[in-house]
Amino acid sequence: MTKSTDILISTHILSGKNKTYDTFTKYISSDFRTIKASNPHEYIEFCWNSYETKCPKAAKTQSLNGKVFEAVVATCLYREGILPMFLQAQVTFVPNVDFDIVLFKEERRSPIGISIKTSLRERYKQADLEAVALKYVHRNAENYLISLQSSEVDTVKKKLKDGSLLGLNRIIAADTPEFDDLISE
């Protein structure tokens, strides 16, 4: 059995032994496959709570928070067998956009873009612009914004519902059962 840390690198969930790698393996788990969680959103909750409570406040930065959250979501997708998965991916003919995660379903040839944000504030606008760019090239592309802040997610969902956002299909809080629904689709 391959060590989880080897899987983190070999699947490109993490690009190597760096600060994110060290943080994930030290404060969350050295083997993410052994974490007991009955569904994806509980896995996200467990991992994020471990990071929040165990990692010293002085070590946390907004950048590290974002990278750790991306790693948590990516390891969750891996655990659920959602592959292939491309991290920090560029899509042909979609210039100047690095998608947090790009997926492809077997039955579809269109990409699924996933934008991952620890908090939304104004960041949902960037995610929507990236989604519009992807849909401009790949008409049937799907785009999802995943965040941790349920209250912010509810606010931005209203903008999606009233038509203020054009590219995003859904906005989901990763620590809710709605995330489980997305994973099962």
Question: What residues fall within each predicted segment?
Answer:
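Conserved catalytic cores of phosphodiester-cleaving nucleases, focusing on short active-site segments
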Residues: 101-103, 107-118, 127
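A short acidic/basic microdomain associated with nuclease active sites
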Residues: 63, 79-95, 104
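Arginine/glycine-rich "motif VI" loop of SF2 helicases in the C-terminal RecA-like domain
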Residues: 132-141
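Active-site-adjacent loop/helix micro-motif of nuclease/hydrolase catalytic cores
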Residues: 117-130, 154-156
